[in-house]
Amino acid sequence: MLTADFEVLDQRFAKLVFGNVYVEKLWTGSRWAEGPAYFPAGKYLIFSDIPNNRTIRFDETDSSVSIFQSPANNQNGHSVDREGRLIACEHQGRCVSRIEHDGTRKVLASHYEGKRLNSPNDVVVKSDGTIWFTDPTYGIDSDYEGDAAKSELGDQSNVYRLDPMSGELTVVASDFVRPNGLAFSPDESLLYIADTGFSHVTNGPKHIRVVKVNADGKTLGESRLFADCSFGCFDGFRLDTNGNIWTSAGDGVHCLAQDGTLLGKIKIPEVVANLTFGGPKRNRIYICGTTSLYSVYVNARGAVWPA
Ligand code: MG
């Protein structure tokens, strides 16, 4: 029997969750929780508390919570690269950075064609080690989540591909209003990108688009609308090994099938900004919900590992 924490809208969802399972509230105390990334080697989760300018570590072994970085350059989205290093989107730093194995911070990308990036928002690492990220203006729109500043790129909020070996930074998409969360399909033939442009444009997008990755693995092809958000907006999201999309929304986590059908919801009593799969079997979803960190076990596994 499913608890009231789940809402089944399509019977396929009933197979992706468990009976007698509840959402757990693990910790509270953030102003805007974002950017969860799970480190399987250390069994901990790193996530952002953007307005409080800190990153937080949840230790899965004893459920303790501690400060990881403070100040933290108003970091937003995170990912873990193929070498197990933390990749961070920095609002205040207006860059994508990496924590090296020796603990030092290295800026990987801060400018495009001589102009400062806006405020990198969310990031994913492809299996070839390249780093793909979005660069909307949220971190420079005000002093709340970074330092207010005028965009040097004009109104352009691009999606970028960074080769961390050569440092080459290329625009892979420039037709989003405010690109936000992003994630590849399990075979990396598709890239899903959220657009939260409704925040800046009347009746603007609050949807996810799906974009074909060209055969070169470096550029993007045609795109189409994947799903509109029915409550709030889609911010960050992850895919499971079967290609289902588990995405943040205004009323919790929405699970979408590959055809875009809303299969069901994990209900969270706060706006959710982002999530990631964790746990030793990567079947535990960690959920950043505004003031709190939540988690829930599901009958699905994260597609990318670590992430
Ligand atoms: Mg985001």
Where are these regions (language model features)?
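Sequence-structural signature of mature extracellular/luminal beta-sheet repeat domains
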Residues: 1-307
